[in-house]
């Protein structure tokens, strides 16, 4: 998506956000700031439903009168409404506002007129109790009036599905901040999503008739929306079917509402914890795009995850389990389990999955599983300050089960940490954007698959590509023993073998591409001639030290320059002191 289109979406978001904050002003007092979202999120969904259905409202009422005595009426009413949902109530926001004395009963009548799938969305918000509180505080009519105003209009002729999706996400962000939650946990900005979509689709077969896309931690489902939008920009005839799972009730409700409005199958949006309550067992997908939580523990899911891991290949987590404090690698394993034989996945991670965990540990075993199956295609390091809730460096992992021949057995690393434009105004900790030009550089680097090539200007915006053999990330961790000695310096023996001195025990990481014995003879024996390897303790490990691969030596400042700078500083200080004491005298 070009920047001017993103800017237009931003303007729509800003306009609607201003209206919504006016509603927040009305709630001040009866509702605490962290409760504003309990009112505004479901009201925004209701108003979006209303404005989408308004043009066909009378047609639905007429159809309902004809078919209401039939046992199955959904199909008729959905056809009349033009959507996967409908409302058979005679009320609209306009007629609700015309009768303020009966606003509660009429509004409840209006809500009860929605189809079952829309009712399910509203149930996730616990909206009935919120309505009761608005009635008790005399704010229900005021809130409906504000949403019913011209500036509260959310119809699809003015607000596209993508626009509305980002309005929802902006609201979630604002109210998560006021609640003290992880503010960006449900929000991935469009610049990052469009980079991910272009990486996924850069080698795609666009002559196909259909594609499936899955997001395992979908939030409000904007990654799915953007992926579908991008596919249709490339080929409008492709039938895109989206699937998603989400554990937060409010964001799930928004995602399901968005899917209903876009005409997709709302049953593909499923509620539950992805790690412990997989809603898509046995499913596989052609594309997976996701930004699961990182740095979050999985204690809540521990029992279910460990039980599934014990099932071996019948489950998703057989390759290994990460440390309990960070479950992001579990989402990677979930994605790989659901990736079709020719599928491709883009998933956001922090730095931990690159190197955390020693040889033989769960995190290392997961990396080994990915690399030895040749599924890791590319890792792109983004700049810091790209997300609203964290300023740390983040990485896009691209995994493929159908690498082209020239990429087989290899992994591409792209350092795009210098490929950004500073924002004029930050959003939380998001101070940097991936512009069209930045995205083009990164996608070009990915497509060309060059080793040691810089794209852009190293004095400005650029990214750098390097290509490695997959085996280069592996190593054998060997245990080096040395013997105990008595006071006379003689080696202590037990059953004719030297007794190891645990205080002198050491380890060495020997690259998989090197012979262990040759390495030992070259790197250890010259310095410890009495040492030996305990081969029973050798373990295979994998790590991806991305920072080391792109490190550039910076020569220290010359001693002469440092001395000259210190001399100038000393002279300045001396002059300042002399002037000070001269004035005091």
Predicted regions and their residues:
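Conserved S-adenosyl-L-methionine
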Residues: 183-290, 294-306, 350-352, 359-366, ...
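Flexible, glycine-/basic-rich loop-and-beta segments that form/coincide
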Residues: 388-482
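Hydrophobic alpha-helix feature that most strongly marks membrane-spanning transmembrane helices
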Residues: 232, 260, 264, 293, ...
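Conserved Class I SAM-dependent methyltransferase catalytic core
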Residues: 26, 35-45, 252, 321-399, ...
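Conserved catalytic motifs of ABC-family nucleotide-binding domains
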Residues: 297, 301-325
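Non-catalytic, mostly N-terminal accessory regions of nucleic-acid modification and defense proteins
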Residues: 1-204, 268-279, 381-384, 408-415, ...
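Active-site lining segments that contact anionic ligands and/or coordinate catalytic metals
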Residues: 284-285, 326-328, 342-350, 376-377, ...
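Feature representing long, continuous alpha-helical segments
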Residues: 225, 253, 290-292, 329-333, ...
């Amino acid at each position: 998506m070009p920047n001017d289109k993103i800017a237009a979406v931003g303007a729509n978001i800003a306009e609607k956000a201003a209206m919504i904050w006016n509603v927040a002003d009305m709630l001040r007092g009866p509702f605490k700031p962290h409760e504003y979202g309990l009112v505004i999120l479901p009201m925004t969904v209701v108003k979006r439903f209303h404005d989408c259905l308004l043009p066909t409202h009378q047609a639905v009422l007429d159809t309902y009168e004809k078919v209401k005595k039939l046992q199955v009426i959904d199909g008729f009413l959905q056809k009349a409404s033009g959507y996967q949902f409908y409302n058979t109530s005679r009320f609209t926001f306009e007629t609700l506002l015309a009768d303020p004395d009966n606003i509660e009963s009429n509004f409840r009548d209006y809500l009860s007129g929605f189809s079952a799938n829309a009712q399910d969305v509203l149930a996730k918000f616990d909206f009935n109790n919120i309505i009761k509180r608005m009635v008790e505080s005399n704010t229900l009519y005021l809130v409906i009036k504000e949403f019913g105003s011209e500036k509260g209009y959310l119809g699809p002729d003015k607000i596209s599905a993508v626009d509305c999706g980002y309005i929802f996400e902006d609201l979630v962000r604002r109210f998560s901040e006021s609640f003290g939650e992880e503010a960006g946990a449900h929000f991935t900005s469009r610049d990052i999503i469009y980079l991910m979509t272009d990486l996924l689709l850069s080698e795609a077969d666009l002559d196909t008739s259909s594609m499936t896309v899955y997001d395992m931690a979908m939030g409000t489902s904007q990654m799915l929306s953007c992926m579908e939008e991008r596919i249709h920009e490339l080929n409008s005839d492709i039938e895109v079917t989206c699937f998603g799972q989400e554990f937060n009730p409010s964001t799930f409700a928004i995602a399901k509402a968005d899917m209903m409005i876009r005409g997709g199958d709302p049953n593909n949006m499923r509620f539950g914890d992805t790690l412990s309550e997989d809603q898509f067992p046995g499913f596989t997908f052609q594309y997976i795009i996701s930004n699961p939580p990182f740095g979050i523990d999985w204690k809540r899911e521990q029992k279910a995850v460990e039980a599934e891991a014990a099932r071996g290949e019948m489950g998703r987590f057989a390759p290994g389990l990460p440390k309990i404090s960070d479950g992001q690698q579990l989402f990677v394993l979930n994605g790989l389990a659901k990736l079709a034989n020719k599928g491709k996945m883009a998933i956001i991670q922090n730095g931990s999955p690159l190197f955390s965990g020693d040889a033989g540990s769960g995190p290392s075993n997961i990396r080994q599983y990915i690399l030895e199956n040749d599924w890791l295609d590319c890792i792109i390091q983004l700049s810091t300050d790209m997300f609203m809730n964290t300023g740390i460096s983040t990485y896009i992992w691209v995994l493929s089960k159908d690498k082209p021949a020239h990429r087989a057995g290899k992994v591409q690393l792209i350092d795009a940490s210098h490929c950004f434009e500073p924002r004029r105004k930050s959003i939380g900790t998001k101070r940097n954007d991936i512009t069209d030009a930045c995205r083009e550089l990164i996608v070009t680097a990915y497509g060309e698959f060059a080793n040691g090539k810089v794209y852009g200007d190293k004095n400005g915006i650029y990214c750098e590509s390097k290509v490695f053999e997959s085996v280069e990330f592996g190593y054998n961790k060997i245990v080096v023993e040395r013997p105990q000695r008595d006071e006379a310096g003689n080696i202590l023996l037990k059953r004719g073998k030297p007794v190891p001195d645990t205080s002198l025990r050491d380890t060495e990481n020997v690259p998989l591409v090197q012979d262990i014995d040759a390495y030992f003879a070259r790197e250890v024996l010259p310095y410890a001639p009495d040492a030996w390897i305990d081969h029973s303790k050798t373990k295979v490990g994998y790590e991806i030290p991305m920072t080391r691969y792109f490190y550039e030596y910076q020569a220290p400042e010359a001693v002469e320059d440092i001395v000259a700078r210190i001399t100038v500083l000393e002279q300045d200080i001396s002059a300042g002191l002399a002037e000070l004491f001269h004035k005091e005298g």
